[in-house]
Amino acid sequence: MQRHEFSFELDAPPELVWEVFWYRGPDRPQPKDVKTRIEILHPGDAIGNGLVRHCYFPVPKWLGSKGVGQSWEWLTEVKPYESWRYDAVGKPLWSHATGRTRLEPIANERTRVTFIEEYEAFNPIMRVLFEKRVHESLSRDNDTILAALNGGLAWHRRRKDKATRAVPGTSDAPSS
């Protein structure tokens, strides 16, 4: 079994960071890289418990999947603005993963984001031969994740500013 944990801090309160992960409006930007995307198969309840998603992500090409991995994930233990858990079945290498994401408020309207994941290939031979290499490959893109979250925060700030300007009486412009 492999375990990966990492954290970083973002210049935004947990409520805004939460939106980057959970906002599902039709205007939500989609990644330009077709190897990375998430399809919501079932939205879960009002706060997201029971959400089921199908994820696509880059994997080493030597796995024989043309460089694209897939996972089917079920989210539980959702605590809005705080944390959630996921259980996943993924391929190639047919595996199970359990992960948690935690948002912790820190000083100056900032948030510490912590990801923890445990990953295990089902097949004991594949586990010995490939599990560690595959997990290391998937876990080394922390900078990419941080850049995506910062981009998501910028997009949500622009979206909120635009919505505020669209509501009469909320603009800073002089009224006539």
Where are these regions (language model features)?
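A short, structured loop/turn motif at beta-sheet edges
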Residues: D11-E15, P43-G48, T76-S83, R102-T114
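Glycine-rich portal/gate segments that line the openings of hydrophobic small-molecule binding cavities
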Residues: P29, E39-P92, I125, T144-S175
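Beta-strand/loop substructures that line and gate deep hydrophobic ligand-binding cavities in soluble
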Residues: D87-R140
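Short beta-strand micro-motifs in enzyme catalytic cores
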Residues: Q2, L51-R53, T111
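Short, surface-exposed coil-to-beta transition loops
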Residues: R3-E5, K66-W72, S95-R100
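Short amphipathic alpha-helical segments
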Residues: P13-L16, S137, D141
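Hydrophobic ligand-binding cavity/cleft-lining segments
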Residues: M1-G48, D172-S176
